[in-house]
């Protein structure tokens, strides 16, 4: 599954994509002062509702888009926590 993160001015959309199909979509509030650890805790809440004990969510890679540069780095760090492969522009590295 690919983790898709779309950072907007009011919400951060998270999606799981497998075999070209959207498996789930969830939203979190965009908070410019939130740290990577705080965003990761919010993401854990989202993923815990979609996790099955015998079949955990595993991400093979991630893609991140953002119009909020203040938090792009924090969410890129979160994406790297869940997968070692992150597709983004050089601005987030």
What are these regions (language model features)?
Residues 2-42:
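Short glycine-rich, Thr/Ser-proximal phosphate-binding strand/loop in the N-terminal lobe
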Residues 87-93:
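Conserved small/polar residues in nucleotide/adenosyl-binding loops
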Residues 1, 59-62:
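Short active-site oxyanion
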Residues 65-72:
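Glycine-rich phosphate-binding loops at beta-strand->alpha-helix junctions
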Residues 80:
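Nucleotide and nucleotide-moiety/phosphate-recognizing core
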Residues 43-60:
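Phosphate/pyrophosphate-binding loops at sites that engage ATP/ADP/AMP, CoA/4′-phosphopantetheine
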Residues 83-85:
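A short helix->loop->beta-strand "cap" motif at the edges of active sites that frequently abuts
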Residues 13, 73-74:
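Phosphate- and divalent-cation-binding pockets in alpha/beta enzyme and binding domains
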């Amino acid at each position: 599954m690919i983790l898709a993160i779309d950072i907007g001015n009011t919400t951060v959309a998270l999606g799981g994509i497998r075999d070209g199909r959207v498996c789930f979509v969830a939203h979190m509030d965009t908070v410019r002062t939130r740290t990577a650890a705080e965003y990761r805790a919010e993401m854990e809440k989202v993923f815990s509702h979609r996790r099955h004990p015998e079949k955990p969510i595993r991400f093979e890679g991630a893609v991140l888009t953002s119009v909020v540069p203040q938090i792009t780095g924090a969410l890129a760090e979160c994406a790297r926590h869940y997968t070692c492969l992150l597709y983004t522009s050089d601005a987030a590295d």
